[in-house]
Amino acid sequence: MSTIKAANVQNTGSGAPTFKNSSGTEIGQLAKAWVNFNGRNTPSIRDSFNVSSITDLGTGKYKITFTNALANVNYAIAGSAAELGSTGFNDVFFGAGRNNNYSDLMTTTFCTVTTSTSSHVDRDIIMAIIFGD
């Protein structure tokens, strides 16, 4: 077993580094973007990677804008949402949607937060992560 200690890891090509097993088969990638934000009132980003802004599109509906565009629109997005306080609601998250301009999805994505009864809601804690090229 070896341990690698480095300040930076860089692909020899133009893409992100990939993780491979001893046979050379790819077994993983790094996230292309992630965000943790407050979805109440005017959305505010707590922390993020490759996310420049969150836009409120109505109750429980948000647009996530990437700092650097993704290579294509074939990415996967996952997330969760929660409410602070005594109620402790944990909600069904994530309807990833799209707008009418398919090419915009390389620079933005859309998400919704809904309850188990399909009502759109704003929540204090909303988190999303994006994997793909």
Set out the residue ranges of the language-model regions.
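Short, surface-exposed, low-complexity cationic segments
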Residues: 69-82
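Extracellular receptor-binding modules and their adjoining Ser/Thr/Gly/Asp/Asn-rich linkers
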Residues: 2-72, 116-133
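Intrinsic disorder/low-complexity segments
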Residues: 8, 80-82, 97
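Extracellular jelly-roll beta-sandwich "head" domains, especially the C-terminal globular C1q domain
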Residues: 85-133
